[in-house]
Structures are given as structure tokens and as C-alpha cells.
Swiss-Prot record:
Sequence similarity: Belongs to the AB hydrolase superfamily. Carboxylesterase BioH family.
Species assigned in the record: Xanthomonas campestris pv. campestris (strain B100)
Subcellular location, record wording: Cytoplasm
Protein encoded by which gene: bioH
Pfam family, one: Abhydrolase_1
Protein name as catalogued: Pimeloyl-[acyl-carrier protein] methyl ester esterase
Gene Ontology CC: one annotated term: cytoplasm
Binding-site list for substrate: 18, 78-79, 139-143, 231
Length: 253
């Protein structure tokens, strides 16, 4: 699995969202690399890990990343948050957890109202088989929908998407399956690590209320909402997200 290592200082592991790669975090790298050693992962089937054979399943990916990185704070965005949360619940070397626009369950249920309908991910999977590039572009648009900086964020995501080659279609389907079926809520009550939950006020994929609900279930958790932020708040609101991460990490024991 490809992992870029940039900067010096306490280690952070950064995990990207569906269809993208570690390069998407460039605005955070610019702000955090002077203070931290950043481990930027390309998940299997994505970016420079296009041909990596690690199954895109939580235990396999987390074990591989943990074996290749030092003790660190794990930061997960969107789909990457599922891997980060699983790591925080199972890997002793995870110092703390930061979730950006991510929750333990992405689909709505009778006891989990602040999420999207399961059919959203099912439809993307069906569309992907018929129109690969068009479906990816529609998903990127959903990432930025509602953001105060939607236009510039969408341009950035489009430029980033294929900068390291196109993601593997099989990995995209596996990722949609994780978003559709994963439910890690039971891990929250016993989460021993401190956690930070950063929501976008205007996020249409992961409502801020859902992130605050998740944080309320975890001990040692804090949550904040980025005003005007969409599903990728670290793009248009990079200063606020970087500052929140910096304050969180600086306060760790």
C-alpha cells in the first residue's frame, strides 16, 4: 500500500474518502507538515495503490497500515473515517482519532435518522457500472454540494481525482459496499482514545447532527461544526480544520 511520509513531528495518519487518494489532503499538508509527520495513505485500488491486492475491508486495510506506520493520531475523511474508527477501536498504537465528515454508520435507520438513504449508495453502484466517469463526477459534485466554496472545491476534487490514475472499478464497488453496510456504532461506547469529530454545516452526505450524535456516544470526544462547510471542509475551510486538528493533537497526553 502506498503511503507518502511528509514533515517532521508527532505522527498523523490521514485516510481519504471514496474514489480519491492521499493527494486530496494537499491543503492540510501545507498547513500541518511544518509541525507533524504526515502519513498519507492511498487505500487499495486508489491512487498509487491501484494494483495493491489488500482486500478493501476494515481489518485487512487497518492491519496493513498499522504495520507500516508508527504510533499516531489517525485522521479519517468520509469513507476513510470507517478505517480510522476501526483502527482506534482495535489498534493500541492509535493515540487518538479525528473524524472529518464521517460517522460510524453512513446510512439512515429508524434509530439513526441523521444520515442518507441506503439507496444513494446502491444507485451509485449501479450507475458506476454503466457510466464510470460520469458517476464519479456526480459523486464529487455531491461532496461539495452546499459548501460556501463549492465551485473551487469541485474544481480541486476534479483535478485530484485522476492525478494518480483512475481508481479501480472493483475498489469503488467495494467502497460503496462499506458505506452502505458498515455500522460501527457499538465501538463508540468503549472507545478508549480521545476523539475529535469535525462536521461541515452544509454537508449533504454526512449531516452535522449525525456527527454530533456519534460523538455523544464516545467518551473523551469533542465535536465541532465548520460554518459553511460541505462534505470536504478541509478544502474550502482548510485553516479552520487544520487549527482544530492542531489544538486537538497539542492537548493529547
Amino acid at each position: 500500500m502506498h503511503i507518502d511520509v511528509i514533515g517532521h513531528g508527532p505522527a498523523l495518519v490521514l485516510l481519504h474518502g471514496w474514489a480519491l487518494h492521499g493527494g486530496v489532503f494537499a491543503p492540510l499538508v501545507e498547513r500541518l507538515a511544518p509541525h507533524y509527520q504526515l502519513h498519507l495513505v492511498d487505500l487499495p485500488g486508489h491512487g498509487f495503490s491501484h494494483d495493491d491486492t489488500t482486500p478493501l475491508a476494515l481489518p485487512h486495510v487497518v492491519a496493513a497500515i498499522a504495520a507500516a506506520t508508527p504510533a499516531a493520531v489517525w485522521v479519517g475523511w468520509s469513507l476513510g473515517g470507517l478505517f480510522a474508527l476501526h483502527a482506534a477501536a482495535t489498534q493500541p498504537q492509535v493515540r487518538a482519532l479525528a473524524m472529518i465528515a464521517a460517522t460510524p454508520r453512513f446510512v439512515r435507520g429508524s434509530d439513526w435518522p441523521d444520515a442518507v438513504e441506503r439507496e444513494v449508495f446502491v444507485q451509485f453502484g449501479q450507475d458506476l457500472a454503466r457510466d464510470y466517469r460520469g458517476t464519479l463526477d456526480r459523486f464529487l459534485a455531491l461532496d461539495t454540494l452546499g459548501s460556501a466554496h463549492a465551485r473551487s472545491e469541485l474544481r480541486s476534487l476534479r483535478e485530484t481525482l485522476t492525478a494518480r490514475g483512475e481508481p479501480a472499478a472493483s475498489a469503488l464497488q467495494d467502497g460503496l459496499g462499506l458505506l452502505e453496510r458498515t455500522d460501527l456504532r457499538r465501538a463508540l461506547a468503549t472507545l478508549a482514545r480521545p476523539s475529535l469529530w469535525i462536521a461541515g454545516q452544509r454537508d449533504r452526505l454526512v449531516p452535522a447532527a449525525g456527527m454530533h450524535a456519534a460523538a455523544a456516544r464516545a467518551p473523551h470526544a469533542q465535536a465541532l461544526t465548520i460554518d459553511g462547510g460541505g462534505h470536504a471542509p478541509f478544502l474550502g475551510h482548510a485553516d479552520q480544520v487544520a487549527e482544530a486538528l492542531h489544538r486537538f493533537v497539542a492537548a493529547l497526553p
